[in-house]
């Protein structure tokens, strides 16, 4: 069977499984998720062995450190995946819930009911944990899903897929509700993008090149998980000691992820006190500063002059753009010009400035006095996420169970006819 026929067959089976899954009981879906959590814990050694094969191949191919970090699984990350399964299992099931109702003058009762999106195709790179997060969220929301992970994670993804199939079968749900593409041929992506008859929405999660390619090819709606060019603005009068720790966490904890900080904008009145403290705190961790002319002498030996192309750059590394700005207007203008609608934060003591920043910074999450690293489904209480949408339609920000459903109108009558 050639790739086009294989992918069309997967789409057809996903559509059939999706119809069954949409009608599945909340207990069956929760049971599958709980069983998957147990399987992850019981089969940890096999998962780590599969991941070790991926890591060895990646190292031989010269993969850079940030991508290796995203590829790597550990006992701790497997425990986190199991915990996410149980958390999502315990969430309220949105499918079939009537969220709001109103009565018309003619007596009709009108409501909006939550329903699955249908069949989702997920295209992603590097991170094997996305296989689990995507599967459990789609399952909970009643969606069938076709998962196409990166070739660098093929052994890990297939090992996880086997557990998902076992968990689904254990409660009588169709195994085809979650399918992982087993070939690493990149032609799969183009074939998935053609299947508008069987796939309702496609979600690319990865580098800019991947996302642009999917947007260009897809015949169905695309929910984009675009790059994370995240900024922090240090306002005049901010708590500088607190801000140093926020910036350190946002940049250093995991520099290769999409909610890591990439740009630091500092009010001119705070630069002399704040930037040397930042240089000391982050410089000890090996951070390189790409600094504007005014900030360069305040950052010491860890700083080099910024270039124009550093603006709007997602470094995925221990590199931080630093600019001194005159006021919030200039900070917001910079964010509007170079941000990616992902995450923006402000450190401030001024309530009015905080509220203005929340209103005017255009991003899927805007935070006051908190790290950009909190733009994450688990951290925001969603249990897990299938991605962080930087598109405003149909969802904006981390996409949990609720965001993987839509609504339809339901009408209750007593014989009314239209006059």
Swiss-Prot record:
GO terms for biological process: L-proline biosynthetic process. It is found in: Cytoplasm. Catalyzes the NADPH-dependent reduction of L-glutamate 5-phosphate into L-glutamate 5-semialdehyde and phosphate. The product spontaneously undergoes cyclization to form 1-pyrroline-5-carboxylate. Transmembrane segments: none annotated. The gene is proA. Belongs to the gamma-glutamyl phosphate reductase family. GO terms for molecular function: glutamate-5-semialdehyde dehydrogenase activity; NADP binding. Its EC number is 1.2.1.41. Keywords: Amino-acid biosynthesis, Cytoplasm, NADP, Oxidoreductase, Proline biosynthesis. The keyword Amino-acid biosynthesis applies. This is Gamma-glutamyl phosphate reductase. The keyword S-adenosyl-L-methionine does not apply. Pathway: Amino-acid biosynthesis; L-proline biosynthesis; L-glutamate 5-semialdehyde from L-glutamate: step 2/2. One of its GO terms (cellular component) is cytoplasm. CDD domains: ALDH_F18-19_ProA-GPR. It catalyses: L-glutamate 5-semialdehyde + phosphate + NADP(+) = L-glutamyl 5-phosphate + NADPH + H(+).
């Amino acid at each position: 069977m050639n790739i086009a026929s294989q992918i069309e067959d997967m789409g057809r089976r996903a559509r059939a499984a999706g119809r069954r899954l949409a009608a599945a009981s909340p207990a069956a879906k929760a049971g599958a998720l709980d069983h998957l959590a147990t399987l992850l814990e019981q089969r940890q050694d096999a998962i780590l062995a599969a991941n070790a094969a991926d890591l060895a191949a990646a190292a031989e191919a010269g993969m850079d450190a940030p991508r290796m970090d995203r590829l790597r699984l550990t006992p701790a990350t497997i425990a986190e995946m199991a915990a996410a399964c149980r958390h999502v299992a315990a969430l309220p099931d949105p499918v079939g819930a009537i969220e709001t109702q109103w009565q018309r003058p003619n007596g009709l009762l009108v409501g909006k009911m939550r329903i699955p999106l249908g069949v989702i195709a997920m295209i992603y790179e590097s991170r094997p944990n996305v296989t689990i997060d995507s599967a459990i969220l789609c399952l909970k929301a009643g969606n069938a899903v076709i998962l196409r992970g990166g070739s660098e994670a093929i052994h890990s993804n297939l090992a996880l897929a086997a557990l998902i199939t076992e968990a689904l079968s254990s409660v009588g749900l169709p195994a085809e509700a979650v399918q992982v593409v087993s070939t690493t041929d990149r032609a799969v992506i183009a074939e998935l993008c053609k299947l508008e008859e069987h796939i309702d929405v496609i979600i690319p999660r990865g580098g800019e090149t991947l996302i642009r390619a999917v947007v260009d090819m897809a015949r169905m709606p695309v929910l984009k998980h675009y790059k994370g060019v995240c900024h922090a603005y240090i306002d005049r009068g901010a708590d500088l000691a607190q801000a140093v720790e926020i910036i350190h966490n946002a940049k250093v904890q995991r520099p290769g992820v999409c909610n890591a900080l990439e740009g630091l904008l500092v009010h001119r009145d705070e630069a002399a006190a704040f930037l040397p403290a930042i240089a000391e705190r982050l410089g000890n961790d090996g951070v390189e500063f790409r600094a504007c002319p005014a900030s360069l002498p305040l950052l010491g030996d860890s700083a080099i002059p910024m270039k124009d192309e550093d603006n709007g750059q997602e470094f995925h590394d221990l590199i931080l753009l630093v600019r001194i700005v005159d006021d919030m207007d200039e900070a917001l203008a910079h964010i509007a010009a170079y941000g990616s609608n992902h995450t923006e934060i402000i450190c401030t003591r001024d309530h009015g400035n905080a509220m203005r920043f929340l209103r005017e910074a255009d991003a899927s999450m805007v935070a006051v006095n908190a790290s950009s690293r909190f733009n994450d489904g688990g951290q925001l209480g969603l249990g897990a996420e299938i991605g962080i949408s930087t598109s405003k339609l149909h969802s904006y920000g981390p996409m949990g169970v609720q965001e993987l459903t839509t609504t339809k109108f339901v009408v209750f009558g007593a014989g009314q006819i239209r006059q």
